[in-house]
Each structure stands twice: as structure tokens, then as C-alpha cells.
């Protein structure tokens, strides 16, 4: 789908056009969302561009993502999308700036693009040319990633409180046994996946912004200032995301340690139960009635004496370490 936007007094305005109609001269932003081959050829012929294919957009080399060609600036970024679903993912979006027009090529519909259009309608003075539209789109993407990082930070704090909050544990003695470590591990895993995708997206945006500032394409001082500010924001967010990743690993290790402690407690319970059940089992297994020699004189006394010693040795006497028998056989 090809969406065409032009500048108006009320901000960006989408132009309704027929499928076969030529591109209007006043177009500032051409947004290609899952474009058809015909739409790609139309934009390429009108602006003299070579729009990257979906496979080319996925290439990880910087030379394939960030370059200048025939007076056009090509910028491809990895953007985290589908954050409101159970399976967030990263997708590539290409920005092409040539002259007074901006072209975006994408195969996902992330929330920052829709937010940017709404913001432009409320603040028409913020987007006066194609360069400002480019800066505005990147700002919207960065703000969305900031929301993700803040949400992950809150999730980590909540998970940490579930593990280490002593007041909560003392208020409810049964809380520890009622905690669902499976759900806790799922929350930690989801937070880890989100923070990893956010860090990947931030690294991509950092390279994009650095290349855009060093490009030979003419940009207004205002736009360059906005790009420098975004670069600083991305660096700060990357550092904070790295801190959260480290903290998340600590919470994960603590959760696994709690699981190990609970497993050991269960094993202790089984050990105590075994202490009380083993002596009767030994006596029952002896089958005294079927041992005729044991009924005769001293042999019977010796046999019953050994059984009594086994019972006494199995009892946890006061002062003995838990789980340690009196005698070792």
C-alpha cells in the first residue's frame, strides 16, 4: 500500500489518490507498507530511486544498510514491533531521503508511525519539510523503545519484590509455598526477550543516527540538532538497557536458587518420613515367623536384639544432626 502525505496548515495531510494516478508534486512523504511491485516501480521512476528489496533490508552489513547513492540517503533500521502481543519481534524499516521527499519502505505497521501521524496533526509546526519528517519518525521510534525499557524495569522490580520482600513473606507465612516459580520464570524470560530486542534496535538506531549526521546530504541546523539529541538519548537508553539486562540475570539466578532451596526442603521431608517408615519395613521384611531357626534359644534373642538396635539407630536423638544416623552400617 502506498500512502502519500503533503504538508498543510493543519500538519501532515494524507492525499487520496487512485491506484493508477501519478504522484502529486506537493508530496513530502511517500509511505510504502508491504508495497506491490507496481507501487515500487512508480516511486522509483518518479524519484529516480532504487528501493531495497525485503531481502536486502535484512542484510546486517552497515554498507548495505547505510549509504548514499545518486544524491539520496538510504537508512535502514531495526525496529521492535508487536509489543502488545505475546510474540514481539524486530523488523527492518528503510528511510530514503532525496531532495524534498522522504520515502519509507516497511513490511510492518509499528505503533510509532501511527502516533507520528497523530502528533503531526496536533503540532503542524514540527514538520516543515521531509528532513523534519525523518527526524520526527525516528523520535517516535525512540520514544516507543523508551516505553519498552521502562516496562521491563517495572517487571524486573516486581519480580525482585516477589523473591526478596521479607515484609511480604512475614505477613503471609504460606506465601513462599504458594509462589508459582513457573510463572515467575516466564515473566523473567519475557522481560529478557524484550530487553534483548530493544538493545538490538537501539544499536541499529545509533549507527543510523551517526551516519545521518556525517552524510553529505543537506540538512537544516534544526534537524541536525534534533539528530544529535536523539543520538545522546539512544546512548543513554543503551546504557540503561545494559544495566537492566545485568539485573535481570541476577533475578534469574536468585529465582533458580529459590527453586533449588524448595527442592532441598522437599527432600528433607522425604528423609524424615523415611526414618519413621524404614524400621517397620525392616521388621516386616525379616519375616520372623518363616525363620524356624530364629525361634530356638539364643538365635531368637540375637535376632530380636539386632532388630532393636536397628530401630534405635534410626531414631533422630536429641543433639544429633538432622538426617544423621546413630550408627553407620
Task: Specify the residue positions occupied by each region the protein language model found.
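Surface-exposed loop/turn and secondary-structure junction residues enriched for glycine/proline
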Residues: 15-18, 52-54, 60, 69, ...
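Small/flexible residues
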Residues: 16-19, 201, 292, 298
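A cross-family signal for key residues in well-ordered alpha-helices
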Residues: 44, 135, 268
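Hydrophobic alpha-helical transmembrane segments and their immediately adjacent juxtamembrane loops
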Residues: 48, 232-329
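Helix-boundary and N-terminal cytosolic regulatory elements
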Residues: 1-125, 150, 204-219, 311-329
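Extended amphipathic alpha-helical scaffolding segments in membrane-proximal extra-membrane regions
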Residues: 38-39, 68, 78-257
Amino acid at each position: 500500500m502506498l500512502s502519500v502525505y503533503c504538508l498543510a496548515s493543519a500538519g501532515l495531510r494524507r492525499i487520496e489518490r487512485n491506484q493508477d494516478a501519478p504522484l502529486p508534486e506537493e508530496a513530502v512523504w511517500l509511505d510504502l507498507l508491504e508495497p506491490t511491485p507496481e507501487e515500487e516501480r512508480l516511486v522509483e521512476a518518479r524519484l529516480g530511486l532504487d528501493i531495497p528489496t525485503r531481502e536486502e533490508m535484512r542484510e546486517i552489513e552497515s554498507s548495505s544498510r547505510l549509504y548514499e547513492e545518486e544524491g539520496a540517503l538510504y537508512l535502514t533500521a531495526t525496529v521492535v514491533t508487536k509489543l502488545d502481543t505475546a510474540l514481539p519481534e524486530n523488523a527492518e524499516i528503510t528511510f530514503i531521503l532525496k531532495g524534498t521527499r522522504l520515502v519509507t519502505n516497511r513490511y510492518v505497521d509499528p505503533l510509532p508511525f501511527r502516533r507520528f501521524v497523530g502528533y503531526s496533526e496536533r503540532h503542524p509546526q514540527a514538520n516543515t519539510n521531509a528532513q523534519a519528517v525523518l527526524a520526527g519518525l525516528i523520535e517516535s521510534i525512540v520514544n516507543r523503545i523508551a516505553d519498552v525499557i521502562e516496562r521491563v524495569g517495572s517487571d524486573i522490580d516486581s519480580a525482585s519484590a516477589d523473591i526478596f520482600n521479607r515484609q511480604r513473606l512475614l505477613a503471609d507465612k504460606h506465601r513462599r509455598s504458594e509462589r508459582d516459580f513457573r510463572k515467575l520464570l516466564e515473566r523473567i524470560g519475557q522481560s529478557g526477550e524484550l530487553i534483548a530486542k530493544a538493545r538490538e534496535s537501539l544499536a541499529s538506531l545509533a549507527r543510523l543516527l551517526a551516519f545521518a549526521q556525517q552524510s553529505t546530504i543537506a540538512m537544516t541546523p534544526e534537524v541536525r540538532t534534533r539528530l544529535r539529541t536523539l543520538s545522546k538519548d539512544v546512548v543513554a537508553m543503551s546504557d540503561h538497557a545494559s544495566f537492566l539486562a545485568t539485573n535481570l540475570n541476577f533475578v534469574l539466578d536468585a529465582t533458580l536458587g529459590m527453586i533449588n532451596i524448595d527442592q532441598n526442603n522437599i527432600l528433607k521431608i522425604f528423609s524424615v518420613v523415611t526414618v519413621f517408615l524404614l524400621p517397620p519395613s525392616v521388621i516386616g521384611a525379616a519375616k520372623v515367623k518363616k525363620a524356624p531357626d530364629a525361634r530356638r534359644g539364643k538365635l531368637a534373642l540375637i535376632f530380636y536384639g539386632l532388630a532393636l538396635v536397628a530401630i534405635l539407630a534410626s531414631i533422630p536423638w536429641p543433639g544429633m544432626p538432622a538426617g544423621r544416623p546413630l550408627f553407620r552400617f
